[in-house]
Curated annotation (Swiss-Prot):
Pfam families: PapZ_C (PF22740), RapZ-like_N (PF03668). GTP binds at residues 63-66. Belongs to the RapZ-like family. The keyword Nucleotide-binding applies. Gene3D superfamilies: P-loop containing nucleotide triphosphate hydrolases (3.40.50.300). This is Nucleotide-binding protein str0831. The keyword ATP-binding applies. It comes from the Bacteria. Disulfide bonds: none annotated. Displays ATPase and GTPase activities. Keywords: ATP-binding, GTP-binding, Nucleotide-binding.
Amino acid sequence: MKTKIINLVVVTGMSGAGKTVAIQSFEDIGYFTIDNIPPSLVPKVIELLKHSEETDKIALVVDMRSRVFFDEINDILDQLESNEKLNFKILFLDATDGELVSRYKETRRSHPLAADGRVLDGIKLERELLSPLKSLSQNVVDTTKLTPRQLRKAISEQFSSKQDQSSFRIEVLSFGFKYGLPLDADLVFDVRFLPNPYYDPTLRNLTGLDKEVYDFVMTHKESEDFYKNLNHLIKPILPGYQKEGKSVLTIAVGCTGGQHRSVAFAHRLAQDLKNDWTVNETHRDKDRRKETVNRS
């Protein structure tokens, strides 16, 4: 039986340097993540996940919020280093004192080591306490000049495998405007201007996934022209979204009730995009009218 190797990244560093963004980034690229874990619990988490088939990638934030436990960190790191079943790295996030002070002023939060004092005093104490840990870190990232988006991109590029690079996915969603806009949509397209199958009694109870409705919607010249223009708009911008570190792009297509036109349009778009991208296709309101009729 092949021995399972666990990829472990311990994320640490200065408070305010971007550890929250970092751990979210690891989650986006498929890591199991825990924020603010006491060092003594790290080996126990690894032992639990060693027998799990769900993941072999773990990212854990260990920082001065767990100061009462932090004295144990060196012994724990020695254990991790000696574990042959671990591919172990430390990611240390840093920033200049001036930038950290600025970030604390912007968020109006107190520093964990200076709750009753000046932020700068807390930063200086933390830097002193973390200095040995920084010297052990294989990856030190200065976030002083980085935006959150740039930090996410840097982490994705550094810690993603080739397989993980496909973690960018597209959600193609159809919906009905009468039931509200999807809150998670990045791009919204309105196809209510197209001929409506609802007014054909033979098509009314079908959906855009049925061939009769699909053909009705997509064979009109207005539909062909709009779909062609939509493709010219969407396809060139997708690499840009991926490059900027976005993990999920939701493209929503809406009609009045979300049963006919938007379903047909979203289905065709999803099928075309699947040639080059990882795509999930969802029809939020496709059966809503049928469910309403059945309840009445």
